[in-house]
């Protein structure tokens, strides 16, 4: 059995998934398999994946070895949003480690080799996994490199201690992710960030720091992305409220950041028209103190989402 599963949730990404596939074919270490979770695509994703393993009559689920020497597994599911793709992945992964590579991203040629070597040398039950870097298409790490003396870290500490604020790439122990999966969402809401599961695990276990490029992303920070997050706040308020509740309960969180989460929690509850907003929280004083700020934030979000 391989050490690593690379899993890719995809929805109508046939036009970018081939690039991800080619990067996996170029890997200098083939100690991995690729799991594709098709979230109800209506394009030719299934047929394209089938062609890579010479599957002539692809069913909803199939698997086979591609010419590059690694196993590809394909699972089709009804469209349900990103977190349901993660749920399906964790239910079907049986390797020691797993990492998500999005359908419009790709891996540098030696990424798997670096992951496997790092885990063989440093991995143990003490760690949740490995944290590495995302690079942009110009060859620069998002948010810069980690400090040279940072050998391990808790995920939340990167943000709280202002060590690294940009996206990173987490390679997780599968057994730990299975303990917190599935992530139960809300009917009609498809924007429940799978970081919800990651935070639960990484509040108790540190990550080994691998100061290397593990994923290349086409990262663009523009107005459309900003508007997109406001629309997500509007479209999935119960999901965001649940995430903020978790953030307030994380033992590694600080009062400052718990209060920030409380503000966002109030805002999400206002948008969701959730009358149980106070009774659901175990930090009632903090939430009550955040009410005026949360009300103001909800108004701002509603206005931003309309633009």
Stretches with model-predicted labels:
Residues 13-26:
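Short, well-formed alpha-helical segments that are part of the catalytic scaffolds
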Residues 23, 38-48, 102:
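A conserved acidic beta->alpha catalytic loop
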């Amino acid at each position: 059995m391989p050490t690593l599963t690379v899993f890719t949730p995809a929805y109508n990404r046939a036009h970018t998934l081939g690039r991800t596939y080619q990067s996996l074919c170029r890997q200098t270490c083939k100690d991995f398999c690729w799991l594709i979770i098709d979230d109800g695509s209506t394009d030719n994703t299934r047929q394209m994946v089938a062609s890579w393993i010479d599957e002539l009559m692809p069913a909803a689920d199939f698997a086979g070895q591609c010419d590059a020497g690694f196993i590809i597994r394909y699972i089709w599911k009804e469209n349900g949003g990103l977190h349901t793709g993660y749920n399906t992945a964790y239910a079907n992964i049986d390797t020691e480690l797993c990492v998500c590579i999005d359908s419009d991203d790709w891996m540098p040629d030696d990424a798997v080799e670096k992951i496997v070597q790092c885990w063989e040398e440093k991995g143990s039950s003490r760690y949740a996994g490995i944290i590495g870097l995302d690079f942009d298409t110009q060859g620069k790490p998002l948010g810069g490199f980690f400090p040279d003396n940072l050998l391990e870290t808790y995920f939340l500490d990167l943000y709280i201690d202002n060590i690294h604020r940009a996206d990173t790439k987490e390679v997780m122990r599968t057994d730990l992710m299975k303990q917190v999966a599935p992530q139960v969402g809300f009917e009609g809401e498809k924007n429940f960030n799978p970081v919800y599961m990651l935070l639960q695990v990484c509040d108790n276990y540190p990550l080994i720091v691998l100061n290397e490029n593990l994923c290349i992303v086409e990262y663009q920070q523009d107005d459309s992305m900003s508007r997109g997050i406001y629309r997500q706040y509007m479209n999935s308020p119960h999901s965001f409220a649940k995430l903020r509740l978790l953030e307030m309960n994380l033992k590694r969180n600080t009062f400052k950041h718990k209060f920030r989460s409380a503000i966002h929690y109030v805002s999400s509850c206002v948008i969701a028209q959730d009358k149980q907003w106070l009774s659901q929280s175990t930090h009632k004083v903090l939430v009550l103190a955040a009410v005026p700020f949360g009300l103001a934030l909800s108004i701002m979000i509603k206005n931003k989402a309309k633009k």
